[in-house]
Every structure is written in structure tokens, then in C-alpha cells.
Amino acid sequence: NALGCMILIIGISCGFIYFNRFNQIDNQRKLYSERYKKYNNIDKVHLIDQEIVFSQNDKKISVNSHIKIQNRNHQEVDKVMFYLNPSLQIEKLTRQGEDIPYKRDAQVIIVEHKLHPYESLELDITYNGSIDENICYLDITDEEYYDTQTGSSILRFGKRYAFVQDKFTLLTPECLWYPSTFPPVNPEAPYNIRKNFSNYTLKVIHPDDRTILSQGQPSQSGDTMIFRNKEQLPGISLAIGDYEKKSIVVDSVQIELYNFKGHDFYSEVFPNISDTLSGFLQDVKSEYELRKGRKYPYQKFIMAETPISYTGYVRNWKGNSEQTQPEMVFLPEFATTLPSSNFKFAKKRMANWGRRDPQGAMEEIDVEMNVIRDFVRRVLLSEETFQEEGNTFVNMFSGEWSGTSKLNKYDLSSMYFNYAGSIYSQNFPIIDIVMNTMLKQEESDQGRHFFRMFNGMGDDQRAA
């Protein structure tokens, strides 16, 4: 009948729309991967300095980037390449106020300009638009990219890799929100990537009172927040949101915690720690630095809340996720999905254990400190984390729990190693990740770590 035919047509149409959406994503990701491969063997120049002036209007950003680059190759280059998010449109590209011809091929910008060995060039690039998240994580498998499961949870939170919204903005180097001269990924040979440590200055024009977070020392000038970095960094990030701030200085490092307004679920759980928190964090910091054999390299450390849908991946060839950046770590709102984050339950469990101690029950302050210590150790100071698998309710009724050990997205060791320096060899491009993996090791089994690191490499990369 007519009603049945109409329902059938509607169902087929919905299925086609659903399929077409994923087909478009696949086509875009394939296009961007092909563009990386197309220009992979062309000599790249080094980014020396970059000053970024950023503003946002609704879901669009406007940026002016002043760039200084240098040809550090031993031969002349006849073109200069930049990488920029493909949804960001270039208004003008100039040198000393004069337009310079360029070509655009998806995320690749080709500037026809010769540079002799070690010759420098300064350019201004003005661009605006939105962020295409399909450019992110082209070096992971489709299975992992489209997998929306989070451990054993039956909930699906979705996956986002960048935000440009009225109330929240989050941009990391992965989404190419500013020009870079080296690609962030190499889909053809993932381990053959180079880091480019540069001097960054970020100026964010903001007419409202939202909190702005980035690397570097912040200062206010009128309606502009300025971040100046003393250290050279492989990239910078930007977060803008309605945050509440808590801070403390530990061993000359400014530690800052930012949660969304109304999301402070933890203060009431730990009412007794204010007087002892500084000493506790000092002990944790000293112990961790002793284990790693080096000091924390920055002057501040930021923990910032993000929407739960914000997603990243730990890739063996990078050694870290986008959730962990120089000076910054991005944590899911309300600590959802993080181990040991149910603080009230953890306090009850810790108190019950203490009551069984023949020496007597623990004091409330000791219970709170042990809960925080367990959370910090499992979330921030562990290279691996245990993730439950299957269905929570099925596991609960069957009494059978299974899981696997996975690399920890929030592991801070990358701040001490991966983001602190790099080694590059054209003949042995994997040397940087090998050295960082070796340096990170403590008393654990190095053979196991190296097996994990090389897992997934192609034969050509193993033979390189």
C-alpha cells in the first residue's frame, strides 16, 4: 500500500544519507592522504619564528601569521611548502607588503620562491574560515577511526578532534590551525616524521570574558591576550572556554587546573588537603623526576577540561596523544572515562581498607591524599592504562571481566622527552622515537616496549 511504500522510501533515503556522510568522510581522508604522499619527497624548509594573531567570530576564525623560515638543506629549494587546514581560505600571502604567487592543493600551499642553503625568508599569511576535522589522524586505521566504543561502557560519546564554537574553542597542531612547514603525519611511512622546534608568539583578540589558554607566559594588552614562549616548541595549542581556575606553585612551577563553570565536583570530596597539597605535589614531582632522570622543562603545567567527545590517539611513531601537549594536558569533563575518578567511592574503599589495618584506621587527610595519589599515578604518571572490554552489564552479571593494557593518552612523560627535543637522521628516521623510548624506560621490561613500538610497522620501515 501507499503507506508501506512511503515508509520504505523514507528508510532507504535515511540509509543513503547515512552512508553518503561516511562516504564523503572517506573520500576526504583519502584525498588528504594522497596530497601528503604527493609532496612527501620535496625538500622542506624549517620554521624559525611564527607570530599568530587570532580572532574568532561565531564558528569562523580569522588569523594573521607572520612567519620566518630558513632553508636548512644543503641544496637550493625552488619552492616553499606550507601545510594548513583545507577549510581555511587564504586571503593574502605577502612578503614585505607585496603579494607572492602561490598554489593551493587541499592542505598544501606551494609558494614559488627560491631559497639558497641557509637563506631565510619572512612572509605574512592572512586566512580565515572553519576547521575540517577530517584532516586529523590520517595515519590511523579506519577501524580505529570509526570505533566509537569507550572501554566497556555502553555509552557512545562521539569523536571530535577540534572545536570552534561560540562557547568553546580547542585547537591543537593536529588540525593544522596555523601554517607549518613539516606535515604532522606521514601516512605513507608513519615513523618518518620530523619535528620542527620554533619560537611562537600567540595574540588572541577576545571581546568577551572567556578564559584563554595556551603555552607561554600570558599578558593582557587591551582586548588582546598575548602568550610568549621562552622555549622553542614543536607546536602550540589554543583553548577558549568558560573556565574556573585553581592554581598552586610547586618548586617554581605554576600548576593550574581549569574546569568548566559548575563542573567542580571534587572540592567537596577533598576538604582537608589545602594545607598539605603543596608538599604532596612536591613529593610527587620529585619522585617522578627521579624516575625519569630529568627535570620538568617548563615554567607552568595546565590541566584543562574538555568536552567528553574530544578524542585523541597514542600513535607509536609519535609517542604521545594530542591530549598531552607541551605544558598542557586536556582531560575529559567530570573526569569521565578516567581511572580512579569516582572519588567518593574511592574514599569509602580506602577508608574501609584502613579500618582493617591492625595499626588503626587512617585519618581523613590520609585517605584523601591516598585517593589523589592513586588518581595522579594512574592518569598522569603511567605510560600504560588498563581498559575494560565488553559490555558493563554483561560483565557484571556474568562475573567475568576482561580488558587490555593500552598506551595512556594522558601520560606526562612526553613533556619530558618527546616535546623537549628531537634527533633526526635521513638514513634512520626512526632514531628519534627509538631514543625517546629508551630514555623513558625505568625498571620495566625494555624488550616489551620495543616490541610494542615496532608493532604495526611495514617491512620497508623495519629494514630502513
Q: What is each of the regions a protein language model found here?
A:
Residues K68-H74:
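Asparagine-centered strand-capping/turn motif at beta-strand->loop junctions
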Residues L202, I226, V249-Q461:
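Juxtacatalytic substrate-recognition/specificity segment
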